[in-house]
From Swiss-Prot:
SUPFAM superfamilies: F1F0 ATP synthase subunit C. The record marks 58 as: Reversibly protonated during proton transport. It comes from Orientia tsutsugamushi (strain Boryong) (Rickettsia tsutsugamushi). It is found in: Cell inner membrane. This is ATP synthase subunit c. The gene is atpE.
């Protein structure tokens, strides 16, 4: 195979990193909604932890996207 085709295959596999980040954020907010339904008085602490976790999960997706763009144009 041509090395350029390997590059495009690697870019396609980086989409799995973005999909994993989306699933992670969905899982975090699903757990947040279940936790708020069980204990509404702890909403402030739960929201802080969920937003930090969602930010970290989304950062992994952004890193994967940036690496895919860099690989595509180099």
């Amino acid at each position: 195979m041509d090395p350029i085709s390997f590059k495009y295959i690697a870019i396609a596999f980086m989409a799995f990193g973005m999909a994993g980040a989306a699933l992670g954020v969905a899982s975090i907010f699903n757990a947040l909604m279940n936790s708020i339904a069980r204990n509404p008085s702890a909403i402030e602490d739960l929201q802080k932890a969920a937003l930090i976790g969602a930010g970290l999960a989304e950062a992994m997706g952004l890193f994967s996207f940036i690496l895919a763009i860099l690989l595509m144009f180099t």
